[in-house]
Regions:
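Residues that form generic nucleotide/phosphate-binding pockets
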Residues: 18, 38, 66-70, 157, ...
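A beta-strand edge to alpha-helix "cap/lid" segment located at domain peripheries
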Residues: 2-11, 72-212
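A solvent-exposed, acidic/Ser-Thr-rich amphipathic alpha-helical stretch
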Residues: 32-97
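Short acidic-aromatic low-complexity motifs
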Residues: 3-42, 73
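Short, well-ordered amphipathic alpha-helices
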Residues: 19-21, 64, 123
Length: 212
C-alpha cells in the first residue's frame, strides 16, 4: 500500500487495544492464525534465529501460514504478556515488550518462562484502496528474543518430562528447509523495518568512518 497520512495517537491506541484482545483470544485456543487479519496485505514480519538464519514472511498469507502458523503450532498454552508498550504516533510505530511463558509448571509450582527481554516492533498504516480501504493495519513487524534462553527453557521442559507431544513436534521443526527460513543474503525483506532501513527515521548521523 502507499504511504498514508499520519495516524493520531488515539487511533493507534484504539488499534493496539484490539491487538492485545486478539492476542488473548488466540492464546486461549492455541491457534494464532486469526491474528493475520490485523496485518496489511503486503505486510512483512521477521526475526533472527542466528546471524545466518532469519525468518521472514512477506504478505498476509505467509504471515498467516508461516509466522503465526507453522512457527506457533505446538505452543498450546504459551502466552506472551505485554509488560510495557511505547507508542510513537509521529512515526506510526509501537514497541511492545513481552514475557514469554509456557503455561507449564515446574516442580516448585513456578511457570516455565523464557528469561531475557522479548519484544515486537510494529509499524502501522492506514490502507488506501482494496478491501481494507481506510482501515489501520500492521505494515511491518520485527521481533527479538533471547535465543539461548529459549533453547534452555525448552530443554528444561523436555528433561523434566513435561513437554506435551505438540511441543516436541514443534521442536523438531527447524532449519532452512522450513518455509520462511532464509540465509541472511536471501532474506526477501530487510532485517530492519523497510522504512527504517531506507533511512526515513534517522535520529543520529553516522559516526566517522573507521580509519584502521
Amino acid at each position: 500500500m502507499s504511504l498514508t497520512p499520519s495516524l493520531t495517537r488515539a487511533e493507534i491506541e484504539e488499534f493496539w487495544e484490539t491487538w492485545l484482545d486478539i492476542n488473548r483470544q488466540v492464546e486461549a485456543t492455541g491457534d494464532w492464525r486469526p491474528m493475520a487479519e490485523w496485518y496489511a496485505e503486503d505486510a512483512t514480519y521477521g526475526w533472527m534465529y542466528s546471524p545466518d538464519e532469519h525468518f521472514m514472511a512477506v504478505g498476509r498469507d505467509q504471515i498467516r501460514d508461516w509466522a503465526i502458523g507453522i512457527e506457533m503450532d505446538g505452543l498450546d498454552g504459551w502466552h506472551y504478556d505485554y509488560q510495557c508498550t511505547m507508542i510513537d504516533d509521529a512515526k506510526g510505530m509501537a514497541v511492545g515488550f513481552w514475557k514469554q511463558k509456557s503455561g507449564i509448571l515446574d516442580e516448585s509450582g513456578q511457570e516455565y518462562e523464557i528469561l531475557g527481554i522479548g519484544g515486537s516492533w510494529f509499524g502501522f498504516e492506514r490502507q488506501i484502496g482494496g478491501a481494507d480501504d481506510g482501515l489501520i493495519k500492521i505494515a511491518w513487524q520485527r521481533d527479538w528474543f533471547d535465543m539461548p534462553s529459549t533453547a534452555h527453557t525448552f530443554m528444561a521442559i523436555v528433561e523434566a518430562g513435561k513437554a506435551p507431544d505438540t511441543l516436541l513436534k514443534r521442536m523438531s521443526v527447524g532449519g532452512l528447509k522450513v518455509p520462511g527460513h532464509y540465509r541472511y543474503a536471501d532474506i526477501p525483506s530487510s532485517v530492519w523495518p523497510p522504512p527504517v532501513e531506507a533511512g526515513e527515521h534517522i535520529t543520529q548521523q553516522k559516526a566517522p568512518e573507521a580509519t584502521a
